[in-house]
Amino acid sequence: MKTVILAGGLGTRISEETSTRPKPMVEIGGKPILWHIMKTYSAHGIHDFVICCGYKGYVIKEYFANYFLHMSDITFDMQNNKMEVHQRYAEPWKVTLVDTGDDTMTGGRLKRVADHVKDEEAFCLTYGDGVSDVNITDLVTFHKAQKVKATLTATIPPGRFGALDMNGNKVNSFREKPKGDGAMINGGFFVLSPQVIEYLADDKTVWEREPLERLAEEGDLAAFQHNGFWQPMDTLRDKMHLEELWQSGKAPWKVWS
Protein backbone atom coordinates (compact mmCIF):
# COMPACT_ATOMS: atom_id res chain seq x y z
CA MET A 1 0.00 0.00 0.00
CA LYS A 2 1.17 3.54 -0.74
CA THR A 3 0.78 6.86 1.03
CA VAL A 4 0.61 10.12 -0.90
CA ILE A 5 1.71 13.17 1.10
CA LEU A 6 0.81 16.70 0.01
CA ALA A 7 4.01 18.66 0.61
CA GLY A 8 3.89 21.55 -1.84
CA GLY A 9 2.22 24.42 0.02
CA LEU A 10 3.80 27.77 0.88
CA GLY A 11 3.21 27.78 4.64
CA THR A 12 2.51 31.52 4.73
CA ARG A 13 1.21 31.50 8.31
CA ILE A 14 4.50 30.10 9.56
CA SER A 15 6.73 32.24 7.36
CA GLU A 16 9.32 32.55 10.12
CA GLU A 17 10.22 28.94 9.39
CA THR A 18 9.41 28.62 5.69
CA SER A 19 11.42 31.37 4.01
CA THR A 20 14.21 28.90 3.23
CA ARG A 21 12.40 25.54 3.24
CA PRO A 22 8.97 24.07 2.55
CA LYS A 23 6.62 23.69 5.49
CA PRO A 24 6.91 19.87 5.68
CA MET A 25 10.65 20.32 6.31
CA VAL A 26 10.13 22.44 9.44
CA GLU A 27 11.70 20.43 12.24
CA ILE A 28 10.21 18.97 15.39
CA GLY A 29 12.83 17.44 17.66
CA GLY A 30 15.51 17.81 15.00
CA LYS A 31 13.51 15.95 12.32
CA PRO A 32 11.20 17.38 9.63
CA ILE A 33 7.51 17.05 10.44
CA LEU A 34 7.34 15.10 7.17
CA TRP A 35 9.59 12.46 8.76
CA HIS A 36 7.25 12.21 11.77
CA ILE A 37 4.26 11.66 9.47
CA MET A 38 6.10 8.98 7.51
CA LYS A 39 7.15 7.24 10.73
CA THR A 40 3.48 7.07 11.73
CA TYR A 41 2.53 5.25 8.54
CA SER A 42 5.63 3.08 8.69
CA ALA A 43 4.67 1.95 12.20
CA HIS A 44 1.55 0.46 10.57
CA GLY A 45 3.49 -1.35 7.86
CA ILE A 46 3.20 1.22 5.06
CA HIS A 47 6.67 2.01 3.73
CA ASP A 48 5.97 3.21 0.17
CA PHE A 49 5.53 6.98 -0.15
CA VAL A 50 4.74 9.42 -2.96
CA ILE A 51 5.62 12.98 -1.98
CA CYS A 52 3.90 15.81 -3.89
CA CYS A 53 6.57 18.51 -3.98
CA GLY A 54 6.02 22.17 -4.83
CA TYR A 55 7.47 25.23 -3.11
CA LYS A 56 11.21 24.65 -2.59
CA GLY A 57 10.71 20.98 -3.36
CA TYR A 58 14.44 20.61 -4.00
CA VAL A 59 14.98 20.84 -0.23
CA ILE A 60 12.90 17.67 0.24
CA LYS A 61 14.74 15.95 -2.61
CA GLU A 62 18.13 16.85 -1.13
CA TYR A 63 17.05 15.57 2.28
CA PHE A 64 16.22 12.11 0.95
CA ALA A 65 19.17 12.08 -1.44
CA ASN A 66 21.45 12.42 1.59
CA TYR A 67 19.30 10.41 4.02
CA PHE A 68 21.34 7.23 3.70
CA LEU A 69 24.52 9.13 4.57
CA HIS A 70 22.87 10.92 7.47
CA MET A 71 21.50 7.70 8.95
CA SER A 72 24.58 5.48 8.64
CA ASP A 73 28.00 5.11 10.22
CA ILE A 74 30.47 5.51 7.37
CA THR A 75 34.21 5.57 6.78
CA PHE A 76 35.45 7.62 3.81
CA ASP A 77 38.83 6.47 2.52
CA MET A 78 39.85 9.61 0.64
CA GLN A 79 43.20 8.25 -0.52
CA ASN A 80 41.69 5.17 -2.17
CA ASN A 81 38.37 6.75 -3.15
CA LYS A 82 36.31 4.24 -1.15
CA MET A 83 33.35 4.38 1.19
CA GLU A 84 32.56 1.73 3.80
CA VAL A 85 29.18 1.56 5.54
CA HIS A 86 29.45 0.14 9.06
CA GLN A 87 25.92 0.49 10.37
CA ARG A 88 22.73 1.48 8.58
CA TYR A 89 19.93 3.09 10.56
CA ALA A 90 17.75 4.22 7.65
CA GLU A 91 14.10 3.18 7.54
CA PRO A 92 12.88 0.61 4.98
CA TRP A 93 11.18 3.28 2.92
CA LYS A 94 10.65 3.68 -0.81
CA VAL A 95 10.17 7.39 -1.49
CA THR A 96 9.01 8.81 -4.83
CA LEU A 97 9.36 12.59 -5.09
CA VAL A 98 7.22 14.29 -7.73
CA ASP A 99 7.34 17.97 -8.70
CA THR A 100 3.65 18.93 -8.79
CA GLY A 101 4.16 22.68 -9.33
CA ASP A 102 4.48 25.69 -7.06
CA ASP A 103 0.91 26.97 -7.51
CA THR A 104 -1.02 23.72 -7.99
CA MET A 105 -4.00 23.16 -5.70
CA THR A 106 -4.38 20.04 -3.54
CA GLY A 107 -6.59 18.18 -6.00
CA GLY A 108 -4.27 19.07 -8.85
CA ARG A 109 -1.29 17.69 -6.95
CA LEU A 110 -3.09 14.39 -6.42
CA LYS A 111 -4.01 14.28 -10.10
CA ARG A 112 -0.36 14.80 -11.06
CA VAL A 113 0.72 11.66 -9.17
CA ALA A 114 -2.16 9.52 -10.47
CA ASP A 115 0.18 7.21 -12.39
CA HIS A 116 1.84 6.20 -9.12
CA VAL A 117 -1.40 5.01 -7.47
CA LYS A 118 -3.71 4.00 -10.34
CA ASP A 119 -2.99 0.28 -9.92
CA GLU A 120 -3.50 0.23 -6.14
CA GLU A 121 -6.62 -1.30 -4.61
CA ALA A 122 -6.59 1.66 -2.24
CA PHE A 123 -4.03 4.20 -1.09
CA CYS A 124 -3.58 6.69 1.73
CA LEU A 125 -3.43 10.46 1.38
CA THR A 126 -2.57 13.07 3.98
CA TYR A 127 -1.17 16.53 4.49
CA GLY A 128 2.51 17.16 5.14
CA ASP A 129 2.00 19.52 8.05
CA GLY A 130 0.09 17.69 10.77
CA VAL A 131 0.59 14.78 13.16
CA SER A 132 -1.79 12.43 14.92
CA ASP A 133 -1.98 9.14 16.79
CA VAL A 134 -4.72 7.91 14.45
CA ASN A 135 -4.60 4.14 14.07
CA ILE A 136 -3.82 3.76 10.37
CA THR A 137 -4.44 0.00 10.43
CA ASP A 138 -7.95 0.49 11.83
CA LEU A 139 -8.54 3.35 9.38
CA VAL A 140 -7.72 1.18 6.36
CA THR A 141 -9.84 -1.70 7.70
CA PHE A 142 -12.75 0.71 8.25
CA HIS A 143 -12.46 2.08 4.72
CA LYS A 144 -12.59 -1.37 3.16
CA ALA A 145 -15.61 -2.34 5.26
CA GLN A 146 -17.52 0.80 4.20
CA LYS A 147 -17.17 -0.05 0.50
CA VAL A 148 -16.84 3.61 -0.52
CA LYS A 149 -14.46 5.47 -2.80
CA ALA A 150 -13.09 7.72 -0.05
CA THR A 151 -12.71 7.83 3.71
CA LEU A 152 -11.52 10.84 5.69
CA THR A 153 -10.52 11.02 9.32
CA ALA A 154 -12.98 13.13 11.30
CA THR A 155 -11.57 14.77 14.40
CA ILE A 156 -12.29 17.54 16.88
CA PRO A 157 -9.74 20.35 16.43
CA PRO A 158 -7.75 21.53 19.43
CA GLY A 159 -8.42 24.95 20.91
CA ARG A 160 -5.94 27.67 20.06
CA PHE A 161 -5.58 29.15 23.51
CA GLY A 162 -5.65 28.06 27.13
CA ALA A 163 -8.85 28.77 29.03
CA LEU A 164 -9.40 30.65 32.28
CA ASP A 165 -11.61 29.45 35.13
CA MET A 166 -13.03 32.68 36.54
CA ASN A 167 -15.22 33.79 39.40
CA GLY A 168 -16.49 37.24 38.55
CA ASN A 169 -13.41 39.36 37.91
CA LYS A 170 -11.05 36.92 39.61
CA VAL A 171 -9.06 34.17 37.89
CA ASN A 172 -9.30 30.93 39.85
CA SER A 173 -7.07 28.78 37.63
CA PHE A 174 -5.81 28.04 34.15
CA ARG A 175 -7.01 25.12 32.07
CA GLU A 176 -5.27 23.35 29.21
CA LYS A 177 -6.30 24.31 25.72
CA PRO A 178 -9.88 23.03 25.36
CA LYS A 179 -11.03 21.43 22.16
CA GLY A 180 -13.20 23.48 19.84
CA ASP A 181 -16.99 23.64 19.85
CA GLY A 182 -17.30 19.88 19.57
CA ALA A 183 -17.92 19.83 15.82
CA MET A 184 -15.79 17.37 13.91
CA ILE A 185 -13.70 18.51 10.95
CA ASN A 186 -11.84 16.91 8.07
CA GLY A 187 -8.53 15.93 9.67
CA GLY A 188 -6.90 14.49 6.57
CA PHE A 189 -5.50 10.96 6.88
CA PHE A 190 -7.60 9.73 3.95
CA VAL A 191 -7.92 6.27 2.42
CA LEU A 192 -8.93 6.43 -1.23
CA SER A 193 -9.83 4.29 -4.20
CA PRO A 194 -7.98 5.22 -7.41
CA GLN A 195 -11.43 6.03 -8.82
CA VAL A 196 -11.30 9.39 -7.02
CA ILE A 197 -8.82 10.58 -9.67
CA GLU A 198 -11.83 10.88 -12.00
CA TYR A 199 -13.13 13.68 -9.75
CA LEU A 200 -10.04 15.84 -10.32
CA ALA A 201 -10.26 18.24 -13.27
CA ASP A 202 -6.96 20.12 -13.40
CA ASP A 203 -4.28 21.96 -11.41
CA LYS A 204 -6.87 24.37 -10.02
CA THR A 205 -8.96 21.64 -8.41
CA VAL A 206 -9.16 21.96 -4.63
CA TRP A 207 -9.51 18.44 -3.22
CA GLU A 208 -11.43 19.61 -0.15
CA ARG A 209 -14.14 21.34 -2.19
CA GLU A 210 -15.86 19.94 -5.28
CA PRO A 211 -14.30 16.43 -5.27
CA LEU A 212 -15.07 15.72 -1.61
CA GLU A 213 -18.45 17.45 -1.84
CA ARG A 214 -19.40 15.33 -4.87
CA LEU A 215 -18.27 12.15 -3.15
CA ALA A 216 -20.39 13.06 -0.13
CA GLU A 217 -23.44 13.81 -2.29
CA GLU A 218 -23.05 10.44 -4.02
CA GLY A 219 -22.78 8.57 -0.71
CA ASP A 220 -19.19 7.59 -1.44
CA LEU A 221 -17.44 9.43 1.42
CA ALA A 222 -17.10 7.83 4.85
CA ALA A 223 -15.78 9.35 8.07
CA PHE A 224 -13.48 7.47 10.43
CA GLN A 225 -14.03 9.15 13.78
CA HIS A 226 -10.81 9.79 15.69
CA ASN A 227 -11.06 11.09 19.24
CA GLY A 228 -7.36 10.96 20.04
CA PHE A 229 -4.51 13.37 19.40
CA TRP A 230 -4.52 15.47 16.23
CA GLN A 231 -2.54 18.64 15.69
CA PRO A 232 -1.77 20.66 12.56
CA MET A 233 1.30 22.90 12.38
CA ASP A 234 -0.30 26.03 10.96
CA THR A 235 1.47 28.67 13.03
CA LEU A 236 4.68 29.22 14.95
CA ARG A 237 2.67 28.69 18.13
CA ASP A 238 1.66 25.23 16.86
CA LYS A 239 5.28 24.44 16.04
CA MET A 240 6.41 25.43 19.53
CA HIS A 241 3.62 23.33 21.09
CA LEU A 242 4.67 20.25 19.12
CA GLU A 243 8.30 20.85 20.02
CA GLU A 244 7.41 21.03 23.72
CA LEU A 245 5.49 17.75 23.49
CA TRP A 246 8.41 16.06 21.75
CA GLN A 247 10.97 17.33 24.24
CA SER A 248 8.78 16.14 27.12
CA GLY A 249 9.20 12.57 25.89
CA LYS A 250 5.42 12.20 25.73
CA ALA A 251 4.61 13.11 22.14
CA PRO A 252 1.21 11.43 21.55
CA TRP A 253 1.88 10.90 17.84
CA LYS A 254 5.05 8.87 18.48
CA VAL A 255 3.45 5.48 17.88
CA TRP A 256 6.73 3.85 16.82
CA SER A 257 9.33 2.35 19.14
Where on the chain are the PLM-derived regions?
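A generic fold-level signal
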Residues: T20, A90-P92, M105, M166, ...
